[in-house]
Amino acid sequence: MNYELDSELGFSRETIATCLERDGLLSVELEFTKKCNLRCIYCYSEAGEGLEQELSLREIVSVIEQARDLGAKKIVLLGGGEPFLFPDILEVIRHIYALGLSQAVFTNGMLLTEELCRFLFAHRVQVAIKHNSVHPAVQDALAGVAGAHRGIQRGLRLLMEAGYPGEGRPLCIQSVVCRQNRDEIEPMWIWAREHGITPYFEELTIQGRARQHAQLALPPEEIRAIFERLSRIDRERFGLRWDPRPPIAGFTCRRHLYSCLVNSQGFVQPCTGIELPIGNIREQPLGAILRESKIIRDLRGIYRQIDASCRVCQHAGECYGCRGNAYQATGDYLAADPACWLRQGTRATVCH
């Protein structure tokens, strides 16, 4: 089984090609608020307190409907902080469900209740829950809050008791691969697979709070070794085949061919890592913002536009590394990903 082609994490190459031909969308990522009940030391958005003039329910619904009209099939509820701190999150989920769109929510799990988990299951919401470590001290340190491990484990248990993963409702555990948890990655991966849970394990991008904790990041050679071991485990134990490449184990990022992000103040940007606003949905329709953006055009044509050293790589046309990592490390979203081990001659890391 080719895991990437069958995984619920992405879209098929054929679907992406059709999206590019019609210059549309397949998904949109939404941030609701910067408010968060954790203070993760690697948080890309430095979430904590909410911002002024964050999007209203009406504005969020409008973005979702505009995305649907542009061809989006999936809405990814990132939160920006913790999505379940947004007071109207249940109305957002109901609306997406009524439109017949797929939806996924990324949560730290701390606010989950039995009732909420049943609601998510009933509305066919895919859930990705934070899960960086099985050790309380490590998880709490990474989350920046005492007791985080206990709350996360409780949330995971409640999701599984509600029926996840099952009946077309995938459950993911999300982890950043870093120095503190590198020895836990393989056992957590195996545990997830054995329970039908999708492991969403990604390398660290040095942005936000992670800039103050750059020692968290592992060198590319070590990330490569970890990903290769995970690939071998999947092949030998679970019959799943995928090629190890950054930035996510078992999954190649292709979101820049079909997606964008709208943050909690309405600014549109390519992804969480490329913090370059290309417009604001309070001033222009989403479709117009995307059509008029050179940045989006560059990224839709990434395999032609990317740094020359990547275009001659044997993996050119299949992989573009992490564009967010490239931008955060170099200031150029078309630069080679300095954490990529596939590109010949790459020895630099994002930990200068």
How would you describe each model-predicted region?
Residues 2-19, 24, 46, 273-352:
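Flexible mid-to-C-terminal extensions adjoining Fe-S/redox cofactors in radical SAM and related proteins
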Residues 2-126, 218-219:
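Conserved alpha-helical substructure of the radical SAM core
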Residues 30, 34-37, 247, 265, ...:
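Processing junctions and N-termini across compartments
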Residues 83-84, 112-113, 136, 207-209, ...:
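Short secondary-structure capping/turn micro-motifs that flank functional sites
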Residues 1-9, 55, 69, 99-102, ...:
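Radical SAM enzyme [4Fe-4S]-AdoMet core and its adjacent flexible, acidic
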Residues 60, 223, 286-289:
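Hydrophobic/aromatic residues in well-formed alpha-helices
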